[in-house]
From Swiss-Prot:
The gene is atpE. Keywords: ATP synthesis, CF(1), Chloroplast, Hydrogen ion transport, Ion transport, Membrane, Plastid, Thylakoid, Transport. GO terms for molecular function: ATP binding; proton-transporting ATP synthase activity, rotational mechanism. This is ATP synthase epsilon chain, chloroplastic. The lineage of its organism: Eukaryota, Viridiplantae, Streptophyta, Embryophyta, Tracheophyta. HAMAP family: ATP_synth_epsil_bac. Its main location: plastid. It is found in: Plastid, Chloroplast thylakoid membrane. GO terms for cellular component: chloroplast thylakoid membrane; proton-transporting ATP synthase complex.
Length: 133
């Protein structure tokens, strides 16, 4: 039995195919979704989406949004998403270093909040490359 997974951003469809299982980062922690999962709607946190196709696991960096699960259909609507295999490791590492430097230099609540958010996004992209299952 499989699930139909569709990952959408405002500009494109990132993923639309059948999967065996996913592990999704939500605002209340990670949840595993298998076929015949109970229907839910949940907020998606900045984090890694793990996708199992047969015996292979793939990763995707998600930048926050919402997910709806029901009737073996999973729809994930996010601000942005990148497949781990599409992320350039050197560029992701440079972005992480810049985000860390910007956080150290941040002054005032707004700059600190924005710098923390950029750092979380950068860490998620690096993690999507480095995750092995």
């Amino acid at each position: 039995m499989t699930l139909n997974l569709c990952v959408l951003t405002p500009n494109r469809i990132v993923w639309d195919s059948k999967v065996k299982e996913i592990i999704l980062s939500t605002n209340s922690g990670q949840i595993g979704i298998l076929p015949n999962h109970a229907p839910i709607a949940t907020a998606v946190d900045i984090g890694i989406l793990r996708i199992r196709l047969n015996d292979q696991w793939l990763t995707m960096a998600l930048m926050g949004g919402f997910a709806r699960i029901g009737n073996n259909e999973i729809t994930v609507l996010v601000n942005d998403a990148e497949k781990g295999s599409d992320i350039e490791p050197q560029e992701a590492q440079q972005t992480l270093e810049i985000a860390e430097a910007n956080l150290r230099k941040a002054e005032g609540k707004r700059q600190i909040i924005e710098a923390n958010l950029a750092l979380r996004r950068a860490r998620t992209r690096v993690e999507a490359i480095n995750v092995t299952s």
